[in-house]
A protein has these predicted regions:
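Acidic catalytic loop of the alpha/beta-hydrolase fold
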Residues: 231-235, 262-263
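Short alpha-helix in the alpha/beta-hydrolase fold that links the catalytic acid
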Residues: 213, 222, 236-245
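Primarily recognizes the serine-hydrolase "nucleophile elbow" in alpha/beta-hydrolase
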Residues: 142-146, 152-198
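An N-terminal hydrophobic leader/cap segment in hydrolases
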Residues: 1-44, 56-69
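Short beta-strand/loop motif that positions the catalytic acidic residue
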Residues: 219-221, 226-228, 232
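Post-His helix in hydrolase/transferase enzymes
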Residues: 265-279
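Catalytic histidine neighborhood in serine/cysteine hydrolases
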Residues: 241-264
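Membrane-embedded segments
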Residues: 45-142
Length: 299
């Protein structure tokens, strides 16, 4: 009888890890955010499926836009773009993801956010680890080829499992400006073993979706910021500490007091916007050749 649950986990693990939601609960231009955006379609190499996404340009100097009070805004001295890799429990229309996009824009970034295949507007079925890596590469190609964004102007931002995807992409592109991993884990095996009811199974033997960030992070060659809520009950913050310890300089770690897995905003000095501001300064020091520019970000 013990073999049946193991067989179930082996065969159905992709359906347990990825939870595609087709319906977008919010749009960027809904009143709560009022974000200007362009619908984009991203081609996946060697696939007929396309990824649906939103290009959200940085605010212009003349634009009045919604801001979080007492937080930094328009911090950039040269154009920069955030390539936002969401988690896999929701799609890009989730309130918390769009709140994050709005905060990025307040800081002066343009943002490309998209859904993995099978999610939201994107075509295709349940993805796999290899396929979400391919999807992130397709989004990178879109920024480089279609938007003509220089690689050093791209900050890759990954949230939860999206952090593992972002890390893989950043390793393949050491020319990127930097990497931010938020609420992410050391490996899928350890993330699953954190769930007590699954500890009875030989997860390491059954799991094919590895997402082994702890092994990979040693190969990273771009500046990195790890952010994690101290009250995260989904992925313990000590996993970000271990990733930080394994990573090479330049690196930063920001543990947000009382923040959970998704709702990470805390006002004042504990604000993740201020952490991103400090990281952006680190990125600029690491890439001093970037020309100063009064524009907020790439159009």
């Amino acid at each position: 009888m013990e073999k049946l649950p193991c067989l179930f986990l082996l065969l159905r693990q992709r359906h347990l890890i990825y939870r595609p939601a087709a319906e977008l609960s919010l749009q960027p231009d809904d009143a709560v955010f009022n974000l200007p955006h362009e619908d984009v379609w991203i081609s996946i190499p060697n696939s007929q499926a396309r990824l649906g996404g939103w290009w959200i340009p940085a605010p212009t100097q003349q634009e009045n836009f919604i801001v979080l009070p007492s937080e930094p805004s328009n911090i950039l001295t040269s154009p920069k773009v955030i390539l936002y890799l969401c988690g896999v429990g929701r799609n890009m229309g989730d309130y918390n993801y769009l709140a994050r996009v709005s905060a990025f824009r307040q800081l002066g970034f343009s943002v490309l956010v998209f859904d993995y295949r099978g999610y939201g507007l994107s075509e295709g079925d349940f993805p796999s680890e290899l396929q979400v890596y391919q999807d992130s590469q397709a989004a990178w190609n879109y920024l480089r080829d279609m938007r003509q964004i220089p690689p050093e102007q791209i900050i890759i931002y990954g949230e939860s499992l999206g952090g593992a995807i972002a890390l893989d992409l950043a390793i393949r592109h050491p020319e990127a400006g930097g990497l931010i991993m938020q609420s992410s884990f050391t490996s899928m095996t350890e993330a699953i073993q954190h769930r007590r009811f699954l500890q009875i199974f030989p997860v390491g033997l059954l799991l094919t979706e590895k997402f082994d960030s702890l092994s990979k992070v040693r190969s990273l060659r771009v500046p990195i910021l790890f952010m994690h809520g101290s009250a995260d009950s989904v992925v313990p913050s000590e996993m970000s500490q271990r990733l930080y310890d394994a990573a090479s300089e330049p690196k930063q770690l920001f543990i947000i007091p009382d923040a959970d897995h998704v709702k990470i905003y805390q006002p004042g000095e504990q604000s993740y916007l201020k952490a991103i501001q400090r990281f952006t300064e680190l990125v600029q020091q690491h890439n001093p050749g970037q020309p100063p520019n009064n524009s907020s970000a790439a159009d």
